């Protein structure tokens, strides 16, 4: 039998079982757990495109026509991809049919090859992923819709779904993620047609009677946002959650920093055990001072972080005060405004936030775009936090001296499957699984989490790192992110989703508003609990000292040092 050295094999076909890769310049090492391309019975039946390679007529490419059946040829095949997802770290071919993932396994020509479950035919396009990591598109569930250019930045970072509220650079939007009222919701849904991004909008949830809240849900809001700047009282919380229970949408909350209408215990009591998504759960982004982080221990609370406090570094505290003053329309000349801002910034709780992420007690990551957070850094900050925790805390249960697979799965779930579950869209997006929308992000391992090579939306290339369009080949400088054909014309509307409430979809608001994008309803939200947060469902007993701000989880003091240096930073950004 012919053999090939392991390194030569990896360079030709990508890594296989037992091979290890470093993620960017972090201390995180993955190890390939399985190789689905071996379903042919072993090595030797791999497919690869190019001169002298195997995807040629009568070889790895057969004669079958494209169609909907498993025996038909797929529209596009991604060869030899290294999939990194919450469910595993595996090598596989990926077949795309229409906008969705049709199969994950072994591609080729079943007329001459064994074990083929992805058929390559004359109508099949090829994307070569040898040596590349492929992840599900990220989901950012905390967007202030302050400017549409955020979407360009987010897409270029590997985010393919953005959820939040706002109407542009309005004062209310600067501070709160709310698109208030049916008219504003309609305008934002119409604007969404222009962007190669899955979008969903939050209505304003601050009301003590349900009529105006229900009106926003009927108009298309996929969630309601409770924000202290509008008055997050126990009455408003109870009313908002009652409407959510009736309409199967999510409620996101930014609680009462000043403790004017109650303390954290009063807010938890107002939840009445109902599911809720708590934004910036550490508290620097807002929430009961100093102990909002107690909600991490509640079974019905789905906690997330925003990225300005991720991870805790020597610069974190210094940058927060000015950010906070601007975002919440505060005046540094007013003593009460300054005290309000300073009450939210606590080194002890920010340090504990790092550890709670590593324990799987904070379930999600998001940006808080242009409202103290950076829309293009959700993915980067997630992996910087994972790196810092490995360096400071060592291995997680399930990891070994060879790999950090358990930690990698925990952290990737924070911006993929868990926000999808929390917001009722995991049937469409959030992971690389058969039947789901083909939002896929391709990374060179050295650039993982920092700069993707290619972004697919709904099975079609929407963005790529592309060289000079006038060059003789695609690679000459300057290489930068450029929109591809999936970002234009009718292809855009066919390859991206707009999420609506079930009530709005049933009422056919798409026709009434004149929408062109594919529409999908959120569902199954009210039954989601903390235990459903994949790899991130821990509910420790939380204690926070009101005087010292020290944080304990299950009696253990949570503290760590700020990072002096981080990976995935200046080495990658010269300009």
Curated annotation (Swiss-Prot):
Q: Name one Pfam family in it.
A: Amidohydro_1
Q: What is one Gene Ontology biological process annotated in the Swiss-Prot or TrEMBL record? A: urea catabolic process
Which EC number(s) are documented for this chain? 3.5.1.5
| Pathway where it operates | Nitrogen metabolism; urea degradation; CO(2) and NH(3) from urea (urease route): step 1/1
**What cofactor does this one take?**
Ni cation
Q: Give me the residues that bind Ni(2+) 2, please.
A: 225, 254, 280
**Annotated positions binding substrate:** 227
Name the enzyme's class. Answer: hydrolase
Q: Quote the record's binding site residues for Ni(2+) 1.
A: 142, 144, 225, 368
Task: List every position bearing N6-carboxylysine.
Answer: 225
Among the GO molecular function terms of this UniProt record, one is: urease activity
Domain Urease intervals: 137-575
Q: Which domain of life is it from?
A: Bacteria
Magnesium as a keyword of this entry, yes or no, is no
Family that this chain belongs to: Belongs to the metallo-dependent hydrolases superfamily. Urease alpha subunit family.
Please state what the protein is called. Answer: Urease subunit alpha
Instruction: Please tell me the species this chain comes from.
Output: Leptothrix cholodnii (strain ATCC 51168 / LMG 8142 / SP-6)
């Amino acid at each position: 039998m012919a053999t090939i050295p392991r390194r030569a094999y990896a360079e030709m076909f990508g890594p296989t079982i037992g091979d290890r890769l470093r993620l960017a310049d972090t201390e995180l090492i993955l190890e390939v757990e399985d190789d689905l391309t071996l379903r042919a019975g072993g090595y030797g039946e791999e497919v690869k495109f190019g001169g002298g390679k195997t995807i040629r007529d009568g070889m790895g490419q057969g004669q079958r026509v494209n169609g909907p059946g498993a025996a038909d040829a797929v529209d596009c095949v991604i060869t030899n991809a290294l999939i990194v997802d919450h469910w595993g770290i595996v090598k596989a071919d990926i077949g795309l049919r229409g906008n969705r993932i049709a199969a994950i396994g072994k591609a080729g020509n079943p007329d001459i090859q064994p074990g083929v479950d992805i058929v390559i035919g004359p109508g099949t396009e090829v994307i070569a992923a040898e040596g590349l990591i492929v992840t599900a598109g990220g989901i950012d569930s905390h967007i202030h819709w302050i400017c549409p250019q955020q979407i360009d930045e987010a897409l270029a970072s590997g985010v393919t779904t953005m959820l939040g509220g706002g109407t542009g650079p309005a004062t209310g939007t600067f501070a709160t993620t709310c698109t208030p009222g049916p008219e504003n919701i309609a305008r934002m849904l119409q604007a969404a047609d222009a962007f190669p991004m899955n979008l969903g909008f939050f209505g304003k949830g601050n009301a003590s009677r349900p009529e105006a809240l229900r009106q926003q849900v009927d108009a298309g809001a996929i969630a309601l946002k409770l924000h202290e700047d509008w008055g997050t009282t126990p009455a408003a919380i109870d009313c908002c959650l009652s409407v959510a229970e009736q309409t199967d949408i999510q409620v996101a909350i930014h609680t009462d920093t000043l403790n004017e209408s109650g303390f954290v215990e009063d807010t938890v009591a107002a939840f009445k055990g109902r599911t809720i998504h708590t934004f910036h759960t550490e508290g620097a982004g807002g929430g009961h001072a100093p102990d909002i982080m107690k909600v991490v221990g509640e079974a019905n609370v789905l906690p997330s972080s925003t990225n300005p406090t991720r991870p805790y570094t020597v610069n974190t505290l210094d940058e927060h005060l000015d950010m906070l003053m601007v975002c919440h329309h505060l005046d540094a000349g007013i003593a009460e405004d300054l005290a309000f801002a300073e009450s939210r910034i606590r080194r002890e709780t920010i340090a504990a936030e790092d550890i709670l992420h590593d324990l799987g007690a904070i379930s999600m990551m998001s940006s808080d775009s242009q409202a103290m957070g950076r829309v293009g850094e959700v993915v980067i900050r997630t992996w910087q936090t994972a790196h810092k925790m490995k360096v400071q805390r060592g291995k997680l249960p399930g990891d070994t001296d060879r790999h950090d697979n358990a930690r990698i799965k925990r952290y990737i779930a924070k911006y993929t499957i868990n926000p999808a579950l929390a917001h009722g869209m995991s049937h469409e997006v959030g992971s690389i699984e058969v039947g789901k929308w083909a939002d896929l992000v391709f990374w060179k391992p050295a650039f993982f989490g920092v700069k993707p090579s290619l972004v697919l939306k709904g099975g079609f290339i929407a963005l790529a790192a592309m060289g000079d369009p006038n060059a003789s080949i695609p690679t000459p400088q300057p290489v930068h992110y450029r929109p591809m054909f999936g970002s234009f014309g009718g292809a855009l509307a066919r390859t991206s989703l707009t999420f609506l409430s079930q009530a709005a979809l049933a009422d056919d608001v798409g026709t009434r508003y004149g929408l062109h994008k594919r529409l999908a309803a959120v569902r199954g939200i009210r039954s989601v609990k903390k235990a459903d947060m994949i790899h991130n469902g821990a509910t420790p007993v939380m204690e926070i000292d009101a005087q010292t701000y020290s944080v304990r989880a299950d009696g253990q003091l949570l503290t760590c040092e700020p990072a002096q240096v981080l990976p995935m930073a200046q080495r990658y950004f010269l300009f």
